[in-house]
């Protein structure tokens, strides 16, 4: 088809659908003996979009995975954290079952169950949320609680979270209302003391107050296509009661709050139960005993805790778990780098002692699984820089000495006459 204003005879052209002349429209597109204007094209697109929206819910109705299926999918990508995966699987299943069947069942109103994830850095909080969204094929966005402030102050407005979610689904409100929002670093917006402050705390308690309605469920007015708000503008109305909010944080020091509560009950003075150091619970064991009162002492306001009824705790990853993370998941780090090297026609081998060394380094840095990539990247940097310019390299071998920075990777060449480089 071509864009035409007049045919060869200079005759005035009209849209074959609405009858408007070429002077009344911006574009007139010509086909074999037929014309269509830009306005009719837009109308056709709107009709098709509406048809797709009507068909989509029927596909979704039969596609809700069971908690067992959700857990099995998480197992493919996330190592360990068995209890957290079970809690998440049930909470997510119940949330989308509620959406699918409406907010009421036999006259009983079904409440919304948002989720709070508590666990150290690099334990898999973000990965769990991302994997869930990918499995359910729903829009997903992340927000950093440390950048949020109350409306009217310098910083990011809490409603910007919904705007980001809309951007992920091309401003399709219906899709956005089925999405998942992950708010990271939620522990960083705790108030500075147990008692309500008489001064304004715009990035702590103030943000918690601002998030309350959004998380519980409200109709948020969001400017279309990310424009700034002004009075004459039409807003997109997004019902957040259908959006699943997952909040996560490391909550450093929460274990001490729990420990104090637990040990206070063991008595004082001559009647106290004396515990040896070896009898004391680990950080993970203490976090598993978290109660709302502990979170209040930490600095979250009671109303905010009430909006996050499902709590899942994640343990710090052990050295063995980090080694598993390096090689077992479907998108394991070693598999990713092997795929990159395969694109150059080269095999990449990680020896077992190299994986041990990577895990030890990550443990020493206290960065959890998040620190694994930077360690591997540093070890392979020079090789990835030189490899595209080299010929006849068949294989690259990484051992413990490479990870420790004592030698370069071993390069194995395909031709016998080629010189081998051991990096010694």
UniProtKB/Swiss-Prot annotation:
Binding annotation for ATP? 120-127
Highest taxon of source = Bacteria
Result of knocking out the encoding gene: Delayed and decreased induction of the extracytoplasmic-stress response.
One GO biological process term: protein denaturation
> Which cofactor(s) are needed, names only?
Zn(2+)
UniProt keyword annotations, A-Z? ATP-binding, Chaperone, Host-virus interaction, Metal-binding, Nucleotide-binding, Stress response, Zinc
List of residues binding Zn(2+)? 15, 18, 37, 40
Do you know which Gene3D superfamilies this protein is assigned to?
1.10.8.60, ClpX chaperone, C4-type zinc finger domain, P-loop containing nucleotide triphosphate hydrolases
Triggers of expression? By heat shock. Part of the clpP-clpX operon, clpX can be expressed individually from its own promoter.
Q: Which GO terms describe its cellular component?
A: cytosol; endopeptidase Clp complex; HslUV protease complex
Q: Which GO terms describe its molecular function?
A: ATP binding; ATP hydrolysis activity; ATP-dependent peptidase activity; ATP-dependent protein folding chaperone; disordered domain specific binding; identical protein binding; protease binding; protein dimerization activity
Q: Does the keyword Glycoprotein apply?
A: no
Q: Which residues form the ClpX-type ZB domain?
A: 2-56
**Mutagenesis / variant outcome for changing residue 370 to K:** No ATP hydrolysis
The record's cofactor note says: Binds 1 Zn(2+) ion per subunit.
PANTHER family linked: ATP-DEPENDENT CLP PROTEASE ATP-BINDING SUBUNIT CLPX-LIKE, MITOCHONDRIAL (PTHR48102:SF7), ATP-DEPENDENT CLP PROTEASE ATP-BINDING SUBUNIT CLPX-LIKE, MITOCHONDRIAL-RELATED (PTHR48102)
Report the protein's function.
ATP-dependent specificity component of the Clp protease. Uses cycles of ATP binding and hydrolysis to unfold proteins and translocate them to the ClpP protease. It directs the protease to specific substrates both with and without the help of adapter proteins such as SspB. Participates in the final steps of RseA-sigma-E degradation, liberating sigma-E to induce the extracytoplasmic-stress response. It may bind to the lambda O substrate protein and present it to the ClpP protease in a form that can be recognized and readily hydrolyzed by ClpP.
Q: Which family does it belong to?
A: Belongs to the ClpX chaperone family.
- Subunit text: Component of the ClpX-ClpP complex. Forms a hexameric ring that, in the presence of ATP, binds to fourteen ClpP subunits assembled into a disk-like structure with a central cavity, resembling the structure of eukaryotic proteasomes. Interacts with Mu phage DDE-recombinase A; this interaction remodels the viral transpososome for replication.
Q: What is this protein called?
A: ATP-dependent Clp protease ATP-binding subunit ClpX
- The species this protein was found in: Escherichia coli (strain K12)
Question: Its encoding gene is what?
Answer: clpX
